[in-house]
Amino acid sequence: MSEEVGAKRWYAVHTYSGYENKVKKNLEKRVESMNMTEQIFRVVIPEEEETQVKDGKAKKLTKKTFPGYVLVELVMTDESWYVVRNTPGVTGFVGSAGAGSKPNPLLPDEVRFILKQMGMKEKTIDVEVEVGEQVRIKSGPFANQVGEVQEIEADKFKLTVLVDMFGRETPVEVEFDQIEKL
């Protein structure tokens, strides 16, 4: 199987069950601190929302589709492989044939199916904002806050917005679909 060198691909990573969120957070921190943003792009925990009715009240629950697994979008290099494998809570890559062998990426159709199930797409969001423009955050913990775009990370579909909190400008990282231009 010929594989494009330097291509961004999705890989499944095995974690301790129940540690998926911690692994995602740890890996995202390591990517930033080890300056791997050009090689490791997104970390996704496959989840789906379920509505459960209890005592006559509907309650939305988020359920892990594949407990014990996290998807990582990366360019497979020795460095990116090392960073992911040595993240606390990661037990290994799925599709790795043993010690020292690199794993096989997930098939594009598999990734599209999983992301579609989660209500996500292989992101192709076109954001019409530029650094310095004012935006309103539509969702998340900073919903309805207005701030100035400080940085745009198109490859990660994220941007940094400066919002006023307690009289200070604070940088907040949000995804493209969480903002609207003013």
Swiss-Prot record:
Record-linked Pfam families: KOW (PF00467), NusG (PF02357)
Any GO BP annotation: DNA-templated transcription termination
Family matches, as SMART domains: KOW, NGN
Keyword set includes Methyltransferase: no
UniProt entry keywords in alphabetical sequence: Transcription, Transcription antitermination, Transcription regulation, Transcription termination
Xref: InterPro entries: KOW (IPR005824), NGN (IPR047050), NGN-like_dom (IPR006645), NGN_dom_sf (IPR036735), NusG-like (IPR043425), Rib_uL2_dom2 (IPR014722), Transcrpt_antiterm_NusG (IPR001062), Transcrpt_antiterm_NusG_bac_CS (IPR015869)
GO cellular component, one term: cytosol
Domain KOW per the UniProt entry, residue ranges: 131-163
Gene3D superfamilies assigned: 2.30.30.30, NusG, N-terminal domain
HAMAP family in UniProt: NusG
Family, as annotated: Belongs to the NusG family.
Function: Participates in transcription elongation, termination and antitermination.
Protein name: Transcription termination/antitermination protein NusG
Native source species: Staphylococcus carnosus (strain TM300)
Upper taxonomic lineage: Bacteria, Bacillati, Bacillota, Bacilli, Bacillales
Name of the gene encoding the protein in the UniProt record: nusG
